[in-house]
């Protein structure tokens, strides 16, 4: 009887371990390209987490950052020539109908492209010689993590885009006091932008690019602020440095001047500032719990038909 109980306990423990990884995508190496990064998003703010050790890149998206701007891309001449087009088609003169349409139906603008804000870059000096690496995306929690070991110190990053606080939140911690040291910067593909210190924030501002003759009208602003547990935080005009901390939490918000397709008169600075202030009021543990609870109200409404192929497997080798 005793042996049966021990066996049952072992089986239950194995089932619980398998369950913990049921809906996790996990890898044993950082992403090398964008398509290998782990996606996070709250429907407005998105992030692609590469999981780099020495140099981490978290590419940032905001749903209203587009090239070009409000304009009319239908031709005012189209309605007037529509009877002629019909006449030619009914007469079997399709080529002539195509020519009339090409000359009168199109304006040269085919829609505006979605564009990135850029990336948040994290630099960890002295982390090149690492072991026990793992990065994962927990689909049940909408939380990504990166774990590795440097010498005898274990490092963990936890990343999520809060559904509640409208912010990207990153916690970096180590199991040795004072071992968290890193530098945060921005990278952006735009030619015209500004990065500067604004109080305790590091600010990136710019605007979408011109497209098909339409000037870029969408302005964006991204704000980053860091809270450290012990240690020091120093904000300069191009980076934020954290030294000697036990842990640190990075808060990133972004906003644009977009109101609707015809109106881009909103104040992106005020929006980004308000998002950041709200996010930083909530302690990290409470922010994570609030995010998970809000996400579960959506995710918990459905159940995957089958995800046994994910169970206890490294995704990079099996999918």
Regions found by a protein language model. Name each.
Residues 40, 80, 167, 247, ...:
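Generic recognition of stable, solvent-exposed alpha-helical segments in well-folded globular domains
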Residues 1-21:
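Bacterial Sec-dependent N-terminal signal peptides
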Residues 270-289:
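Short, cationic low-complexity segments
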Residues 286-306, 310:
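An acidic-aromatic substrate-binding cleft motif
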Residues 24-25, 305, 317:
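Low-complexity, Ser/Thr/Pro/Gly-enriched N-terminal "stalk/linker" regions
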Residues 173-272:
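Extended acidic/polar, glycine-enriched regions
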Residues 309, 316-319:
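Single conserved hydrophobic/aromatic residue that forms the stacking wall/gate
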Residues 21-169, 173-182, 187-192, 196-199, ...:
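Accessory carbohydrate-recognition regions in carbohydrate-active enzymes
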């Amino acid at each position: 009887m005793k042996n049966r109980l021990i066996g049952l306990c072992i089986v239950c423990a194995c089932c619980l371990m398998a369950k913990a990884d049921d809906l996790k995508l996990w890898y044993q190496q950082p992403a090398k390209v964008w398509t290998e990064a782990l996606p996070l998003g709250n429907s407005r703010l998105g992030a692609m987490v590469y999981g780099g050790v020495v140099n981490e890149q978290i590419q940032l998206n905001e749903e209203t950052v587009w090239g070009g701007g409000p304009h009319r891309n239908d031709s005012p001449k189209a309605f007037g020539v529509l009877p002629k087009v019909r006449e030619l088609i009914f007469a079997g003169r399709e080529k002539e109908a195509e020519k009339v349409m090409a000359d009168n139906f199109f304006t040269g603008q085919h829609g505006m492209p979605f564009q990135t804000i850029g990336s948040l870059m994290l630099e960890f000096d002295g982390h090149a010689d690492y072991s026990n690496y793992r990065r994962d995306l927990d689909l049940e929690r909408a939380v990504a993590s990166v774990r590795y070991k440097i010498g005898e110190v274990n490092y963990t990053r936890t990343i999520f885009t809060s559904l509640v606080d409208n912010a990207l939140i990153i916690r970096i911690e180590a199991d040795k006091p004072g071992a968290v040291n890193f530098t945060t910067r921005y990278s952006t593909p735009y030619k015209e932008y500004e990065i500067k210190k604004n109080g305790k924030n590091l600010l990136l501002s710019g605007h979408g690019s011109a497209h098909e003759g339409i000037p870029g009208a969408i302005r964006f602003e991204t704000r980053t602020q860091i809270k450290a547990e012990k240690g020091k935080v120093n904000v300069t005009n191009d980076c934020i440095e954290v030294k000697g901390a036990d842990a640190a939490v990075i808060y990133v918000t972004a906003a644009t001047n977009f109101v609707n397709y015809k109106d881009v008169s909103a104040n992106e600075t005020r929006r980004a500032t308000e998002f950041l202030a709200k996010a930083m009021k909530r302690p990290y543990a409470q922010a994570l719990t609030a995010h998970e609870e809000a996400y579960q109200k959506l995710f918990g409404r459905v159940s995957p038909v089958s995800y046994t192929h994910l169970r206890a497997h490294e995704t990079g080798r099996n999918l």
